């Protein structure tokens, strides 16, 4: 490269950087992101959508000259690559994309080290090959660079071409997916049609809009939501209303549990024999097999939030992290004010995770038994926290000392991605799909099942079982779409988008003192739990703002919204813009008569719930049946075993 003609000009370096970033992004679409790409138009959009913003950003550096212009171009390209790779790793773990809201959850990463490290793949070097080559040239082969300035009069042309390409991209996107930016809640749609870089810009704009919404909110906004939710309220079932008044309420959170495990056998052995028994209808528990999680990016925290508030989580980020200082009318506070319940949460992790130590105060939760109340010695810990069997045993001992009535929420941890378990704790062989995540899930789910059985037996021994309402539920899916190939081997069937929606069943079991069990096939979600519990306790709900309906009410609403705008009814499901029959998961070509009504209801539910959170609307509510929670009243002391970790 001794001649001037063979040197790399700044514009050539610009083109190389744009092309390699575009190719890496296209690679990620097919290797790491599950975007459901079909047809020539969508593939063309995938090739087009990274280019516009990447070229626009990097073209700014064409105004510079000399070596620093190359360095600025390199740094800009590296930052875009880093954004792409950060999304790749995040998607592998959460099946979603990074937003400005999720940056508020970065403090959780330290506590999830093992799970995060499992998200790295051997081929990840592909994302940085070009970066290393460019860095080598900039440091060791500067003589290859033509440092003459690029003609500034052509820079606006490059920028204009980038903007024009963006609008062409948007036109294709709107043709293939109408009202993309105004109606969709699903980040996968946005990334598929706009690319991860334009999505980041879009998310930034939405974040600013949401922050402004609180400042502009008024009592009129609250009135609109109240009028909407009151139209949806259902009458309680007289056979169940008040039957659990002042009974203890125990809520058991099964981490990452999905009900495809119920009655599932691996190598001839039942994966969850105890839960199978509870699901039979012959025990005192009523089992809801068509109960779905409704979480978004907040995952576990979203499930807690939805079940204790009958609100949906946020479309971006976690309500715990972003709206933890809002005013709420939560289930624990209502139970306290109406019937004198004392509430607690028990969890084998530290209290700052998911901002729990702050948000629980706004829920009116009296006590938080975090990791400092348990022996966190290395032998007792696996993956993200305390082993479930030890957690349940110690928690039952704490509960035995409580004064009735209490509302107690237990959050398990062992059945958490990446589903690792000490060999001595494994009592079933892994499945043999070849996918470490799916195969490990079988073992950790069995361990969770055994831990739950030991806990229920412990409650009986301690005299707590008969006088308690006991709820059991899965918080969110454990196996994401990234593992569909392995799931097909495990289940012996094709995992289509419709089937994956079916797999979002996480189950709900409830034991009510004085009532026999059974199987209830109503379609329901986590948003329905709060009104159910209030009615069981004999509390009139007409003045409470809730989006769910009582599971035992004859008027229970069987339309189950998902956070991305999809939904399922007792007859069909709406997934990725298509309608499928629940009977056989086949595509329905004739639109059901109630489809538009249900779709509008789902969109309105999510919109109204978002308005409540973004506007902090409960601060305006003068509810005659509720006194606003004063969070300063609550303080969560460090437990007696704070120094047990070794």
Curated annotation (Swiss-Prot):
SUPFAM superfamilies: Alkaline phosphatase-like (SSF53649)
Pathway in which this enzyme or protein is active: Cell wall biogenesis; lipoteichoic acid biosynthesis
Ligand binding (Mn(2+)): 255, 300, 475-476
Stretches for region Disordered: 623-646
Keywords: Cell membrane, Cell wall biogenesis/degradation, Manganese, Membrane, Metal-binding, Secreted, Transferase, Transmembrane, Transmembrane helix
Main location: membrane
Cytoplasmic-facing ranges: 1-7, 65-68, 141-153
CDD domains per record: LTA_synthase
PTM annotation, UniProt: Proteolytically cleaved.
Binding site for substrate: 416
Membrane topology: Multi-pass membrane protein
Gene3D superfamilies: 3.30.1120.170, Alkaline Phosphatase, subunit A
EC number: 2.7.8.-
Bias kind Basic and acidic residues: ranges: 623-638
GO CC terms, sorted: extracellular region; plasma membrane
Compartment(s) where it occurs, according to its Swiss-Prot or TrEMBL record: Cell membrane
GO biological process, one term: cell wall organization
Extracellular side: 29-43, 90-119, 175-646
Family annotation (InterPro entries): Alkaline_phosphatase_core_sf (IPR017850), LtaS-like (IPR012160), OpgB/LTA_synthase_biosynth (IPR050448), Sulfatase_N (IPR000917)
Positions annotated as active site in the UniProt record: 300
Site (Cleavage): 217-218
Function: Catalyzes the polymerization of lipoteichoic acid (LTA) polyglycerol phosphate, a reaction that presumably uses phosphatidylglycerol (PG) as substrate. Is required for staphylococcal growth and cell division process.
Family: Belongs to the LTA synthase family.
Protein name listed in UniProt: Lipoteichoic acid synthase
């Amino acid at each position: 490269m001794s001649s001037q003609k063979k040197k790399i000009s700044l514009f050539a370096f610009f083109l190389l950087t744009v092309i390699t970033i575009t190719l890496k992004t296209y690679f990620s679409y097919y290797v790491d992101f599950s975007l459901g790409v079909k047809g020539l138009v969508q593939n063309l959009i995938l090739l087009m959508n990274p280019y516009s913003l990447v070229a626009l950003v990097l073209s700014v550096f064409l105004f510079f000259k000399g070596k620093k212009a190359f360095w600025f171009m390199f740094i800009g390209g590296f930052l875009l690559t880093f954004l792409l790779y950060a999304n790749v790793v995040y998607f592998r773990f959460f099946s979603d994309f990074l937003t400005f809201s999720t940056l508020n959850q970065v403090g959780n990463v330290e506590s999830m080290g093992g799970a995060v490290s499992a998200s790295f793949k051997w081929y990840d070097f592909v994302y940085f090959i070009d970066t290393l080559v460019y860095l080598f040239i900039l440091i060791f082969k500067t003589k290859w660079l033509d440092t003459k300035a690029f003609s500034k009069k052509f820079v606006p042309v490059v920028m204009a071409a980038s903007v024009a390409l963006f609008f062409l991209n948007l036109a294709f996107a709107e043709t293939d997916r109408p009202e993309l930016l105004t109606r969709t809640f699903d980040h996968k749609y946005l990334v598929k049609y706009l690319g991860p870089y334009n999505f980041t810009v879009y998310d930034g704009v939405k974040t600013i809009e949401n922050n402004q919404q609180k400042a502009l909110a008024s009592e009129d906004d609250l009135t609109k939501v109240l009028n909407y939710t009151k139209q949806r309220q259902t009458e309680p079932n007289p056979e169940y209303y008040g039957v659990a008044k002042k009974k203890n309420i125990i809520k058991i959170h099964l981490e990452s549990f999905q009900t495809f495990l119920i009655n599932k056998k691996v190598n001839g052995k039942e994966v969850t024999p105890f839960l199978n028994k509870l699901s039979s209808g012959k025990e005192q528990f009523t089992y809801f097999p068509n109960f779905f999680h409704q979480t978004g990016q907040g995952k576990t925290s979203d499930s807690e939030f939805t079940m204790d508030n009958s609100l949906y989580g946020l479309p971006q980020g976690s309500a715990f992290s972003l709206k933890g200082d809002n005013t709420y009318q939560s289930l624990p506070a209502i139970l306290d004010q109406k019937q004198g319940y004392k509430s607690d949460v028990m969890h084998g992790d530290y209290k700052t995770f998911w901002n729990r130590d702050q948000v629980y105060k706004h829920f009116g939760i009296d006590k938080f038994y975090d990791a400092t109340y348990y022996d966190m010695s290395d032998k007792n810990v696996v993956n993200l926290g305390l082993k479930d069997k030890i957690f349940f045993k110690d928690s039952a001992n704490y509960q035995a000392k409580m004064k009735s009535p209490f509302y107690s929420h237990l959050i398990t941890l062992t059945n958490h991605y990446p589903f690792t378990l000490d060999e001595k704790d494994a009592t079933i062989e892994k499945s043999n799909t070849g996918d470490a995540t799916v195969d490990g899930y079988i073992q950790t789910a069995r361990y969770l099942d055994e831990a739950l059985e030991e806990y229920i037996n412990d409650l009986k021994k301690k005299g707590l079982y008969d006088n308690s309402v006991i709820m059991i539920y899965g918080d969110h899916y454990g196996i994401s779409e990234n593992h569909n190939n392995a799931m097909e081997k495990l289940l012996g069937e094709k995992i289509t988008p419709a089937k994956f929606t079916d797999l979002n069943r996480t189950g709900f079991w409830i034991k009510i003192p004085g009532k026999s069990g059974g199987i209830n096939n109503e379609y329901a979600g986590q948003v329905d739990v709060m009104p159910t519990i209030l009615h069981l306790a004999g509390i009139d709900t007409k003045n409470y703002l809730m989006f769910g309906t009582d599971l035992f009410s004859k008027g229970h609403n069987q339309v189950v919204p998902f956070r991305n705008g999809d939904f399922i009814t007792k007859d069909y499901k709406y997934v990725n813009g298509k309608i499928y029959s629940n009977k056989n998961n086949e595509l329905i070509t004739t639109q059901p008569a109630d489809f538009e009504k249900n779709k509008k209801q789902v969109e309105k539910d999510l919109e109204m719930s978002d308005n409540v959170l973004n506007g902090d609307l409960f601060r305006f509510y003068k509810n005659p049946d509720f006194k606003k929670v004063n969070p300063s009243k609550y303080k969560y002391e460090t437990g007696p075993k704070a120094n047990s970790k070794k």
